[in-house]
Swiss-Prot record:
Pfam families: PROPPIN
Gene (UniProt): ATG18
Membrane topology annotation: Peripheral membrane protein
Ranges of biased composition (kind: Low complexity): 285-296
Region of interest (Disordered), residue spans: 267-300
Organism: Coccidioides immitis (strain RS)
Subunit composition and interactions: Component of the PI(3,5)P2 regulatory complex.
Protein name: Autophagy-related protein 18
């Protein structure tokens, strides 16, 4: 049996694992198996909070909505191309294909909107768990230039969009079904997006993976800038804690980084700027903060709808800058230096269970009840680490389980330090 997919639910109280022989659902605190089916080769699955509703992909284009309590299929949908990702909250079901996003009303399962996107083979997309701030974030579609000649009428349709060449994010209100803003997050294409539980913060990473940025939603003000590392690395997972005071990031390295957000300044002009905006001096940002001079210059609006809603998010808004500008030291009034991690975790050495297929992939989340980081790896290991919220530093491994253990006594591998 192999593990195909793993995900936490929206409040991190459950963990769902898709395998070549069905899927399993575990509670995270305390850890234990709560549901299992041994039918189907499950490519993707997604839970709806702590309900019995689960969306699963049994074949590349076929989605089933299941009720695990009644062990019944609520509905089944078939899509024109392979389903790459599922996102759920209490209002919307979002299906991500390579060049389309389908939005459904989760109460009626009716299709309410279709979005044409740039090619998105990695399904880069985030949906806020919040019903009040039902925002969807995905790479800004980039239209293909008009062809230099008219294609033959009998030929295949030409592509309307091209792969993104920069890291801009479109924020879309999935409830009102309208675009609300564009975040100019990175110079290079995106690799991962994450929204916090309230739908008020967006974390972004580019394909370089060295710099993590956090923006307010929907205003698109840049609030935080963090350095993951100096060497490029693929970002596998990013997750805010429930209170949005910490951001956890995993990548193709063995280190998981935890960044401290502190007070959410910049969300309103009346906020008192008590958080530390400057960071310890380090080496240059992502391509020297992705070429600070060009980032800090205003971009011309193009007169289109996107141009009307576009805001230069790398350039902090005038009112926000006026509020916090006096608190920045002279050296960083023009450019924020990225802050280092507050705490970090080293994953235990691999036992080769990954089959030598490359780095061990990991999905991270933070416990709602305790100062703990939960990590699931592509080898089927579930780790729990304690972190010191006052001092930070390296986290301590306190528990370890296997999500692929055939035994029902899933707690038998518990480590107590």
């Amino acid at each position: 049996m192999s593990m195909n997919f793993v995900t936490f639910n929206q409040d991190y109280s459950y963990l769902a694992v898709g395998t070549s022989k069905g899927f399993r659902i575990f509670t995270t605190d305390p850890f234990g198996k709560s549901y299992e089916t041994k039918e189907g080769n499950i490519a993707i699955l997604e839970m709806l909070f702590s309900t019995s509703l689960v969306a699963v992909i049994l074949s590349p284009r076929r989605l089933q909505i299941m009720n695990t309590k009644r062990q019944s299929v609520i509905c089944e949908l078939t899509f024109p191309t392979t389903v790459l990702a599922i996102r759920l909250n209490r209002k919307r079901l979002v299906i991500v294909l390579e060049d389309q996003i389908y939005i459904y009303d989760i109460q009626t399962m009716k299709l309410v909107y279709t979005i044409e996107t740039s090619p998105n083979p990695n399904a880069i997309c985030a949906l806020a768990p919040s019903s009040d701030n039902c925002y969807l974030a995905y790479p800004l579609p980039q239209k293909a230039p008009p062809p230099s000649f008219s294609p033959p009428s009998h030929g295949p349709p030409s592509n309307t969009h091209i792969p993104p060449t920069s890291g801009e994010v479109l924020i879309f209100d999935a409830y009102k079904l309208e675009a609300v803003n564009v975040v100019e997050a990175h110079k290079s294409p995106l690799s991962f997006l994450a929204l916090n539980s309230e739908g008020t913060l967006l974390a972004t990473a580019s394909d370089k993976g060295t710099i993590i940025r956090v923006f307010s939603v929907p205003a698109a003000h840049k609030l935080y800038q963090f350095r993951r590392g100096s060497m490029p690395s693929r970002i596998y997972s990013m997750s805010f804690n429930i209170t949005s005071t910490l951001l956890c990031v995993s990548s193709a390295t063995e280190t998981i980084h935890i960044f401290k957000l502190g007070q959410q300044q910049g969300l309103s002009k009346t906020s008192s700027p008590s958080r530390k905006l400057e960071s310890s001096r380090g080496s240059g940002d992502e391509s020297a903060v992705e070429s600070a001079s060009s980032e800090m210059s205003s971009r011309k609006h193009n007169g289109t709808f996107m141009g009307m809603i576009r805001r230069t998010s790398q350039n902090v808004g005038n009112s926000f800058a006026a509020t916090v500008g006096g608190y920045l030291p002279k050296g960083v009034t023009e450019m924020w230096e990225p802050e280092r991690d507050f705490a970090w975790i080293k994953l235990p050495k691999s036992n080769g269970g990954n089959g030598g297929s490359g780095p061990v992939r990991s999905v991270v989340a933070m416990s709602s009840n305790t100062p703990q980081v939960m990590v699931v790896t592509s080898e089927g290991n579930f780790y729990v680490f304690n972190i010191d919220l006052s001092k930070g530093g390296e986290g301590t491994l306190v528990k370890q389980y296997s999500v692929l253990d055939s035994s029902d006594r899933m707690g038998s591998t518990d480590l107590d330090y």
